[in-house]
Each structure stands twice: as C-alpha cells, then as structure tokens.
Amino acid sequence: MIHYGNCNKICEKTVMNQRTIKTAIAVTGTGLHSGQPVDLEFHPQPIDTGIVFERSDITGSTPIPASAFLVQDTMMSSNLVFGGTRVGTVEHLLSAIAGLGVDNLLIRVSASEIPIMDGSAAPFVGLLLQAGFCEQDASKKFIRIVRTVRVKVDDKWAELRPYNGFELNFEIDFDHPAIDKNFQHAQLQFSTQNFIERLSSARTFGFLRDIEAMRQNNLALGGSMDNAIVIDESNILNEEGLRFNDEFVRHKILDALGDLYLIGYPILGRFNAYKSGHALNNLLVREILSDHNNFEIVTFDDNVTCPIEYLPLNGITVEG
C-alpha cells in the first residue's frame, strides 16, 4: 500500500515534514522550442520518492528522477535524459517546486520539454498553490553544506559555502544599454515568501539576434514576448517593460534555484555566483555530491529550529 501521509492544509501551520500536493492538477502550455502545445500534469508522490518526471506521450516510458547526474545538455536550459528519454527546460518548474518546499511530486509531460508558460516560475507556483499541499509522515531532509566548494570556467564561477540558512547571491556582467549596470547584482535570503514575492515572476530573457538564429535551426519556435524579455541592439522590445529593475539577474537566481534543486534536497548554504549558467550550476552540484565530506543530510524537529522559513501561504496571491 502506498502511504502518502496525513494531509493538513498548509495555511493552518508550518511543518518540517515532507510535503507533496493534495490533488492532481493539469495545465497546457507551449513548448519553447517546438512551438507546439504541451500537456503538463502534477500528481502526489509517496514519501522519500523525490521529484520524478514521466513522459505521458511515450507508452511505458522510464521515469526520470530529478537528479543532477542525469543532466546531459545545458545549452540554454537544463535537460534531463534517462533510459533514452528526455525532458528539457526543467529549471523554472524546479524553481517553483523548491520555492514552495515540495519534496515529492510526479510530473507527467506530453513532450520532450516543459512548457515555457510566461517565461518565469509564477504560473507553476499558481498551479501548485491551486492543487494544495499535503503534510506527510516523514521528516523533511535538508542537505547542509559543511565545506566550501567552488567551480570555475574562464572568468565564470559558482560556489556553495557553509551557512545557517539558504542565501543566493548572483552577479551578471552585460555591457548592453538596456541592462543597467546598477542592477546586475542581486541577493535573496531564501524563504517561501521571498521566493514568491521577489523571484518567482522574473522572466527569462534573450537577444533578438540569437532568437532569429535559433529559429533558422527550428529552435525557439514557441518563443515570443509573451514568454520572454526580448532585447535588440539597444532596447527592451516588450511594451510593458520590466517587472523589476533587476529582473535579468533575478531570473538568473531563479534558474540557479531550479538547477540547485537537482541536488535532491533543500540546501542549507550560501550560493555565490558570477556569470554562472546551467552548465556551471550543474557542475557545482556534481562536485559537491562527489565527496561526502562536503555535506551532511539533516532534519529538524520543528519549524523553530529550522533556519529556513517555509511560511504559511494563506494571504499570498500570485498572478500568472
């Protein structure tokens, strides 16, 4: 018998137990590269099963665990491949899952890529909130960083340091008139509330010249100003402009949060990065997991002793 645990409304109390969603829920979006409709379903999962992807368009497809070791392609997104089956562009969805503290979830998708939605994590957050949450009868596990680990490629680098909480610091370096030099660094002290209010709605961005080149190769066919910030040689082309002055770097933090969740647990540590991307984020996670002296798995008896705030979600609304 599969044991999901006893359900409690998340708005009633904060818990340090594992959680899954209360009810299955589905949505249809557009594939960024294919431009075709993609069906996405979320289903509850038993304790200690983690985040698992499954291709609903392939009969008998092999489930794909959300693991950094299954990332085989980081060209513009994080893409998982297992048993010959691929699920791509997982980082925005994983960021939403991490931001809401979901430990166990089955994600069924009808194509080789997660739908792009509006280019942020906010639509996924709204969908998960609509599904509701179920507290499960098992302690929530965290991975605590106990030794600083840094990876570097050319002038780009990323690191995780010991820290009693979870903090993300990111700096980008774009010499472009539309990307203000004063807004190329951002910091997020992680909590559910900070994630929803300050990070979840930050959209992905791209340069018009790159999008045109990709379309010539039958890529980015679903990309538009409805799901990305588009920049030409001097301006932001979206009529509504930016959602935040520093939306570009906030989105890089959003990406990193999703990439880092492929470590398998919520992180206790300080993430610092300079010009990092999916490849370097993945390399960092693999490097940490390669040596058990870098980390320890811990649990907390209650929310008072846990240094991360998974706040009650009542009263918080998300557009998108």
Swiss-Prot record:
GO terms for molecular function: metal ion binding; UDP-3-O-acyl-N-acetylglucosamine deacetylase activity. Its EC number is 3.5.1.108. It catalyses: a UDP-3-O-[(3R)-3-hydroxyacyl]-N-acetyl-alpha-D-glucosamine + H2O = a UDP-3-O-[(3R)-3-hydroxyacyl]-alpha-D-glucosamine + acetate. The keyword S-adenosyl-L-methionine does not apply. Its cofactor is Zn(2+). GO terms for cellular component: membrane. One of its GO terms (biological process) is lipid A biosynthetic process. The active site is at 278 (proton donor). Pfam families: LpxC. Zn(2+) binds at residues 92, 251, 255. Coiled coil: none annotated. InterPro entries: Ribosomal_Su5_D2-typ_SF, UDP-acyl_GlcNac_deAcase, UDP-acyl_GlcNac_deAcase_C, UDP-acyl_N-AcGlcN_deAcase_N. It comes from the Bacteria. Pathway: Glycolipid biosynthesis; lipid IV(A) biosynthesis; lipid IV(A) from (3R)-3-hydroxytetradecanoyl-[acyl-carrier-protein] and UDP-N-acetyl-alpha-D-glucosamine: step 2/6. The keyword Amino-acid biosynthesis does not apply. Keywords: Hydrolase, Lipid A biosynthesis, Lipid biosynthesis, Lipid metabolism, Metal-binding, Zinc. Catalyzes the hydrolysis of UDP-3-O-myristoyl-N-acetylglucosamine to form UDP-3-O-myristoylglucosamine and acetate, the committed step in lipid A biosynthesis. Belongs to the LpxC family. This is UDP-3-O-acyl-N-acetylglucosamine deacetylase.
